[in-house]
Amino acid sequence: MHNIVAVSSKIAVFVFIRRRLFILKKKPLCVKLLQVISMLNFKIDDLSVWEKLKETTEPIIMYGTGNGADKVVDIFEKLDIKLSGVTASSGFVRERFFRGFPVKSMEYFEEKYGSFTIVITFGTSIPDVMNNIFNIAKNHRVLVPCVPVIGTEIFDRNFLNSHTEEINLAHALLADDFSKKIFEGYVNFQFGGRIEILKEIETPESEIYETVLNFNEEETFVDIGAYRGDTVEKFIELANGKYKKIIAVEPDFKTYQKLIKNCENLKNFTSFNAAITDFDGEIGFSSLAGRQSAIGGENMIKSLSLPTLCKGYEPTFIKIDSEGCELEILSGGEEILNKFKPKMNVAAYHKSEDIFKLPILINAINPEYKIHLRHHPYIPAWDTLFYCV
């Protein structure tokens, strides 16, 4: 039954977006935006990262051996891209194999090949690890074949051609030129995979809070995807410890226990072990490590819509980082977004289509929102977020 509900939910979101796009087409402001031709309104690389790897004559060395690496190898096999070896950070080499390849040090491949292309297949925001990757890029071509955190649709040429109109519309809806520059870089990185693009578009997280989000002592913060309380802690710091209410939600039970432990001494704090979607009831949930936890699976947990979660409160700031359910949460939260117009921080990177579907949906729900985009230091382009005010 819960699978039927989940499918129905996705259909409802699709219908909602199509209905809203139809309405947008009727508005004079948006007619011009929708009159686009089958090309992007900004320049990107001529070849996708997959096409670059298919055409290269250099050996291809994979850096990383986790879940993302498995996904990339599967696509390599499908596209007949030849992999020549696998490497890892020095502490993770050891005597082991990955997908039939012995995991070797970078020095081993330097000596064996001299010149080669490196593909990054893991995620990190650790400064030392990121700096090491950027240093490697000074001597070798480093590409990042992006695979979505949730879903299987990659940002290749077919994907780009299928969604050109939506990408152009989302780009036009952004509130400022800086956000548009970041959007252009993000799309180019997802498509072309050049590591240096990330350096060009990254900003420290403090910048957006200092220039766009202004907190006061009356903030009611709703943290959807609160994890262990890291963003609660960050909010309190940014609000100088003065706020009205914090509501934190985390679907994973073990992580939720750490959340309530870390926040047990906070004043005016309420927490829920639940998933926020577009309906009230129950939904399947897969409790896996880190970013692999997601909606779908045999473990049934409580599901709440945003209006139900916020009943009795007037949210002023909502963070949504829900491993791929952002569209459903927003569509189910239309009442909240229209009634209170809370400031929002919405993850833009879980699914390939999030980068354009999310701003289109937000604008369709409440056209008064000014939508900003930022990418904070991370490889690949995770921690790319919409900030709406």
Task: Indicate residue ranges for each PLM-predicted region.
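Phosphate/nucleotide-binding beta-alpha loop and adjacent structural elements of enzyme active sites
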Residues: 24-83, 89-389
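Positively charged N-terminal leader segments that act as targeting/secretion signals
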Residues: 3-14, 20, 28
